[in-house]
């Protein structure tokens, strides 16, 4: 069995630690604790790291296509490594959830998220597992684009660190249990 866990974000240091890059931040937290290094897979437009957990190959992916084209990298890697859509998890930001909240979902629409729209368009289904991380709504007078491409407020630093650790724990629980539904029950909150 092979699994692929994808964190969404935008490439380049200009986007480091922005709200829209919380998926990249989550992947970075997970792989750091597993001592995995990324290599750039130019053919797939992604940074990819891998390891074995319980005799399963696990790929950790950060597409470098920019958010709105994430589906290009996801589809290419699923096809190349012959990974089932049932073995895909995507981690990304959600405007409609308060900062630091986590929600696990087994399927659903893109909900206005362009990275998820791209993935759905390229793989041809909404039926894949996801972990949404709340980044909150823009403050009065701020545009959505400035909000998602902005950094978290200093007041949110501890919340975000705790959230990333919770996502790390949840992903590791999932990889041990091999059951997304049980992970949802334990970590949705």
From Swiss-Prot:
Catalytic activity: an N-acyl-L-alpha-aminoacyl-tRNA + H2O = an N-acyl-L-amino acid + a tRNA + H(+)
Cellular localization per UniProt: Cytoplasm
Residues the record lists as binding tRNA: 15, 66, 68, 114
Enzyme Commission numbers on file: 3.1.1.29
Domain of life: Bacteria
Active site, per annotation: 20 (proton acceptor)
The protein's enzyme class: hydrolase
Residues of the site described as Discriminates between blocked and unblocked aminoacyl-tRNA: 10
BP-aspect Gene Ontology terms: protein quality control for misfolded or incompletely synthesized proteins; rescue of stalled ribosome
Coiled-coil segments: none
Residues carrying the site annotation Stabilizes the basic form of H active site to accept a proton: 93
Keywords noted in UniProt: Cytoplasm, Hydrolase, RNA-binding, tRNA-binding
Similarity annotation: Belongs to the PTH family.
PANTHER family: PEPTIDYL-TRNA HYDROLASE (PTHR17224:SF1)
Oligomeric form and interacting partners: Monomer.
Functional note: Hydrolyzes ribosome-free peptidyl-tRNAs (with 1 or more amino acids incorporated), which drop off the ribosome during protein synthesis, or as a result of ribosome stalling.
Protein name according to UniProt: Peptidyl-tRNA hydrolase
Natural source organism: Streptococcus uberis (strain ATCC BAA-854 / 0140J)
Lineage, uppermost ranks: Bacteria, Bacillati, Bacillota, Bacilli, Lactobacillales
Gene name in the database record: pth
């Amino acid at each position: 069995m092979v699994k692929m866990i994808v964190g969404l974000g935008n490439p380049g240091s200009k986007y480091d630690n922005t709200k829209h890059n919380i998926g990249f931040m989550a992947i970075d937290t997970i792989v750091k604790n597993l001592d995995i290094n990324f290599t750039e897979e130019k053919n797939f437009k992604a940074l990819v790291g891998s390891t074995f957990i319980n005799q399963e190959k696990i790929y950790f992916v950060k597409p470098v296509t920019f958010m709105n084209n994430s589906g290009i990298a996801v589809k290419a890697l699923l096809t190349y490594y012959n990974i089932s859509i049932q073995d895909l998890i995507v981690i990304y930001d959600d405007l409609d959830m308060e900062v630091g909240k986590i929600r696990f979902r087994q399927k659903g629409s893109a909900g206005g998220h362009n990275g998820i729209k791209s993935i759905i368009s390229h793989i041809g289904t909404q039926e894949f597992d996801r972990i949404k991380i709340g980044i909150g709504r823009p403050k009065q007078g701020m545009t959505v684009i400035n909000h998602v491409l902005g950094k978290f407020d200093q007041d949110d630093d501890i919340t975000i660190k705790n959230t990333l650790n919770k996502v790390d724990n949840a992903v590791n629980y999932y990889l041990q249990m091999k059951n997304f539904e049980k992970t949802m029950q334990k970590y949705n909150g």
